[in-house]
Amino acid sequence: MAGKKVLIVYAHQEPKSFNGSLKNVAVDELSRQGCTVTVSDLYAMNLEPRATDKDITGTLSNPEVFNYGVETHEAYKQRSLASDITDEQKKVREADLVIFQFPLYWFSVPAILKGWMDRVLCQGFAFDIPGFYDSGLLQGKLALLSVTTGGTAEMYTKTGVNGDSRYFLWPLQHGTLHFCGFKVLAPQISFAPEIASEEERKGMVAAWSQRLQTIWKEEPIPCTAHWHFGQ
């Protein structure tokens, strides 16, 4: 939709990967719609994933006992966070939709993306106390997880060996994105692209592109325990 701003947070080492193809088609389709699309390519940026005292450029409030959450909250208020954090916060602040494109690692995100979440979504910027879940500071924004898996779709069902795919999404969709106030759109899961045929992979990319054509008409999921775990 013309005038909308989209941030794609992309976490894959290889530009020619299937994840890279999904990222590229999202850039192409959303740009075609007139959206302004920004990509944070975390590996290309060599993003620091570790949450350390180097994230604070000013004086620590308690240099004797370091508490990352307390210090980054204070640094956010004092505008003394490291520039790589504030650069990403600016991108999030300006975005109407944030898409996270990544391969599933151990039922979660790659370490570099976890580091992005740990460092960028700090108290004062993404949430506060009070000021979380429906009152989170990023309310009014949309978020979407576009995930690739190693296992097949059958493995990620209630009777499959890995359980329903919604189970592993709970900490990310509810505990991170919803906690920060995002309205969460249904995930885009591309199952087992490495063992899929070329025709099947093309179908996954085409399905993602087609979905993006009407993404602005979608309603967010009810980000509740019942949605993730209900029968």
Curated annotation (Swiss-Prot):
It comes from Homo sapiens. It comes from the Eukaryota. The modification Phosphoserine is found at S80, S197. It is an enzyme of class 1 (oxidoreductase). GO terms for molecular function: chloride ion binding; dihydronicotinamide riboside quinone reductase activity; electron transfer activity; FAD binding; melatonin binding; NAD(P)H dehydrogenase (quinone) activity; oxidoreductase activity; oxidoreductase activity, acting on other nitrogenous compounds as donors. The enzyme apparently serves as a quinone reductase in connection with conjugation reactions of hydroquinones involved in detoxification pathways as well as in biosynthetic processes such as the vitamin K-dependent gamma-carboxylation of glutamate residues in prothrombin synthesis. Changing N162H: Loss of activity toward CB1954, no effect toward menadione. The keyword S-adenosyl-L-methionine does not apply. Its EC number is 1.10.5.1. This is Ribosyldihydronicotinamide dehydrogenase [quinone]. InterPro entries: Flavodoxin_fold, Flavoprotein-like_sf, NAD(P)H_dehydrogenase_qn. It is found in: Cytoplasm. Coiled coil: none annotated. GO terms for biological process: quinone catabolic process. Zn(2+) binds at H174, H178, C223. Binds 1 zinc ion per subunit. It catalyses: 1-(beta-D-ribofuranosyl)-1,4-dihydronicotinamide + a quinone + H(+) = beta-nicotinamide D-riboside + a quinol.
